[in-house]
Amino acid sequence: AVPIAKQELCKVIKFMARRLKNEGIEVRMNCEVTPEMLAGEFKDYEVVCSTGAVPKEIPPFKVFKQTMTADDVLAGRKYPGRKIVILGGGSVGCETADYLAPLIDDMFPANRDITVIEMTPSLMPGEGGAAKSQLTMRLKRKGVKIELNSQVTKVDETTITYEKDGQEYHITDADTLIFAVGYAPNKVENTEERVHFIGDCDKVGTLKDAIAAGHKLAEEL
């Protein structure tokens, strides 16, 4: 699935797929690249690694009865319950809340109760513009609970505890905890000069950053 606010990105992916096909570039799906493959079939090739990033989790909090990442939800790998807490109010956390919450004025709502916990004073810190304002307003209209300046301090199998303004609060009726706490580069360990890293596997950034890095490397090669 694609977050509601990023449906237009599908057009970019389809455009790039058409470009690859038109240029006659071979694409191998479901193919794991191994050291043997690099040393054999591709021994004379420059290798560009764009393996992306992996979502971060907080191991001590995984004791909760059901945990998953925002990526798990959006990719359809896991299915949350009805009482959901999303840890992290960045763009991914907010987009996941938007995706899971009932549509505005939905005649058959999903009846999900969603709480977003963010440790900074605002949602999607570091971002701005109309898209941020529209997403924030949409979350409020959908009834998503937003807890800012809040820090989760303890999680056990049934309870999520967080602090806000010096007070301690306990969420005891949640059935799902979703991690939206950032990403870490999924970098392949290889020090050969012919291996190049671009995109999130080099440094976590935006789609624009990844495309620019690919273009720059192609010019250099």
Where are these regions (language model features)?
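Rossmann-like dinucleotide/flavin-binding elements
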Residues: 28-40, 50-66, 70-127, 155, ...
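Rossmann-like dinucleotide-binding cores of NAD(P)H-dependent redox enzymes
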Residues: 1-23, 98-152
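Short amphipathic alpha-helical surface micro-motifs
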Residues: 8-10, 49-50, 66-68, 143
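Local beta-strand N-terminus motif with an aromatic residue
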Residues: 20, 43-45, 173-175
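Short low-complexity stretches enriched in small and charged residues
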Residues: 4, 40, 44-46
